[in-house]
From Swiss-Prot:
One of its GO terms (molecular function) is thiazole synthase activity. It comes from the Bacteria. It comes from Magnetococcus marinus (strain ATCC BAA-1437 / JCM 17883 / MC-1). InterPro entries: Aldolase_TIM, Beta-grasp_dom_sf, Mopterin_synth/thiamin_S_b, Thi_S, Thiazole_synthase_ThiG, ThiG, ThiS/MoaD-like. This is Thiazole synthase. Catalyzes the rearrangement of 1-deoxy-D-xylulose 5-phosphate (DXP) to produce the thiazole phosphate moiety of thiamine. Sulfur is provided by the thiocarboxylate moiety of the carrier protein ThiS. In vitro, sulfur can be provided by H(2)S. It is an enzyme of class 2 (transferase).
Length: 326
């Protein structure tokens, strides 16, 4: 038997009811409205209405008005992500808290350090038992490395362990300030790029250095906002803005974020994303802070896209003065 369903020819078995048609299509009868031959059919009678040859059936439901906004995704090394918040996996009280916080943050990329296994307890829990590498993009880093040699060794092992080519390179100058050692970082970056690694590089908020790393072949530059773990926020928005304007690769603020407003400021400057660890893991309530950071990054990004008003010395009335009665 042939009927017309939403303007298109449709075959139905003889004796099929409206309810049977809807269920066969996968629609819950209580979520739609049906018109048969231009007459609305009462929902309570769907099971009793038997379809006839050439019936004209319209099935409708509610949708939101307007168009869905386009996804504001970003890409690095050929991979596309929706979340612009990247998070670390250290400093949490246990792996369970790590898992819950990452889920709350909405992050898709998580940084992981490479460390020796516990040979005395091979059954000890590992991060991969809680954070699924198939669900999240692991970003191996070189945290704790102070020489180019150590950084390169670390990432070679990371690639062997998980097959990861996308990596975060950081080479530090000292243990007190954890400031980037740019000469050693450059040396390591050159080797890693030649070996096929896709390097996201942690560096100072220096436009010249960021440009050098980009020219070397790094797929993203990650200037610090402030020293690692300091929570001081974006200390030099001027140079961060210059880095964003000149870069042809993603720019992500890395290190120094302390609270949600810091993340929002970084995004308002036009950064493609923000990476943080201590700001979430070190909070009194890491799970709640993870939620806050998720919304802060989104708010900052939307504010950047919307375009802030110009800063001015004098006031401008928001209500028109024309038509006042005094």
């Amino acid at each position: 038997m042939k009927i017309h369903l939403n303007g298109e020819p449709h075959n139905a078995e003889a004796g099929t009811t409206l309810e049977g048609l809807l269920m066969g299509l996968g629609f819950a009868p209580e979520k739609v409205a049906v018109e048969r031959n231009k007459a609305v059919v009462s929902r309570g009678t769907y099971g009793a209405v038997v379809l006839q040859e050439d019936d004209q059936i319209e099935v409708v439901h509610f949708i939101g008005g307007g168009q869905h906004p386009p996804a504001d995704s970003w890409s690095v090394a050929g991979l596309t992500f929706n979340s612009r918040l990247l998070v670390g996996t250290g400093k949490y009280k246990d792996f369970e808290e790590t898992k819950i916080a990452i889920e709350a943050s909405g992050a898709e990329i998580v940084t992981v350090a490479v460390r020796r296994v516990n040979v005395s307890n091979p059954n000890a829990p590992m991060l991969t038992d809680y954070i699924d590498p198939k669900k999240y993009t692991y970003l191996p880093n070189t945290a704790g490395c102070f020489t180019a040699e150590d950084a390169v060794r670390t990432l070679r092992l990371a690639r062997e362990a998980g097959g990861w080519d996308l990596v975060k390179l950081e080479v530090l100058s000292d243990e007190k300030y954890l400031w980037p050692n740019n000469p050693e970082t450059l040396k390591a970056a050159e080797i890693l790029v030649q070996e096929g690694f896709k390097v996201m590089v942690y560096t100072t908020d220096d436009p010249h250095m960021c440009k050098r790393f980009e020219d070397l072949g790094c797929v993203a530059v990650m200037p610090l906002a402030a020293p690692i773990g300091s929570g001081l926020g974006v200390r030099n928005p001027y140079t961060t803005r210059i880095i964003v304007e000149q870069a042809k690769v993603p720019v992500l603020v890395d290190a120094g974020v302390g609270t949600a407003s810091d993340a929002a400021i970084a995004m308002e400057l036009g950064c493609d994303g923000v990476l943080m660890n201590t700001a979430i893991a070190g909070a009194k309530d890491p799970i709640l802070m993870a939620h806050a950071m998720k919304h802060a990054v989104l708010a900052g990004r939307q504010a950047y896209l919307a375009g802030r008003i110009q800063k001015k010395l004098y006031a401008t009335a928001s209500s028109p003065l024309d038509g006042t009665f005094f």
